[in-house]
Amino acid sequence: MAGAVALVGIGCRFPGGIDSPASFWEFLTEGGVATAPMPADRWAAYQGISEEFTAALRLAGRPGNFLGDVDGFDAEFFGISPREAQFMDPQQRLVLEVAWEALEHAGIAPASVAGSDAGVYIGTCSDDYGRRLLEDLPRIEAWTGIGAQLTGIANRLSHVLDLHGPSFVLDSACSASLVAVHLACQALLAGETSLALAGGVNIIGSPAYTLTLHAAGALSADGRSKPFDAEADGYG
């Protein structure tokens, strides 16, 4: 059909142990709730710096929705050395895994798209891990740059899969993933690419973002996001 775009595969990770379209659908149909207490080790790197930090961390230690095993990554599967993986923003690791799963969900062998004009369009808005990498001056090395940059989220995926189409990251805050999908659809309709990997990723690895949202009154009182609901009262 002229002027049509087909969604052929999906990959996902969400709080509540959701790691596939099937588990996401089951979660929705059962009315699941992923809100949980803050993991005890979430802000471990910031503990004990000062009394002021400790007080601030108490404000940031609110219930919310948290991904499990953010540090887990099979680097060698993607041809990445364990050392290089240490310097990768977890958002890069997550996109590699989920994009691979999306291709498999579509029945497309990842190796079959190598050398193609497939594009990568990723929305994000959190760069706190990269900031920490760049501020750790004694440990900066060759892998730090690409591991810290948001553009690496898309570019590393293009590199690993050998994709030659457009590859970029955009930040429009909460709408970033939707804008990424919109731009991917435009590129497909314009004939700029024949296949697009599009979506979003958002891992908040620093209490600073949580405190910023708290100060702005943008956090839900009970740690639950309630999109499209009359009781919606903030980010969860």
Task: Tell me the role of every PLM-derived stretch.
Residues D41-I49, S116-T124, A173-S175, G200-I204:
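A glycine-rich phosphate-binding loop feature that marks nucleotide/adenosyl-phosphate handling sites
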Residues M1-V8, P110-S116, P138, Y235:
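Flexible, low-complexity linker/loop segments at domain and module junctions
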Residues A55-A56, R62-P63, P82-P90, V113, ...:
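Active-site-proximal gating segment of KS-fold condensing enzymes and close homologs
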Residues A6, F14, R93-A111, I153, ...:
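Active-site-proximal alpha-helical scaffold in enzymes
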Residues A36-A40, T144, T151-S158, V179-Q186, ...:
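Glycine-/small-residue-rich "gating" segment that lines the acyl/pantetheine channel
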Residues M1-F87, Q92-L96, W100-E104, A215-G217, ...:
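ACP-dependent fatty acid/polyketide chain-elongation machinery
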Residues I10-G11, D69-V70, G123-C125, L161, ...:
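Fold-independent oxyanion-binding glycine-rich loops
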Residues G3-A6, G64, D117-V120, P166-S167, ...:
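Beta-sheet entry/capping signal
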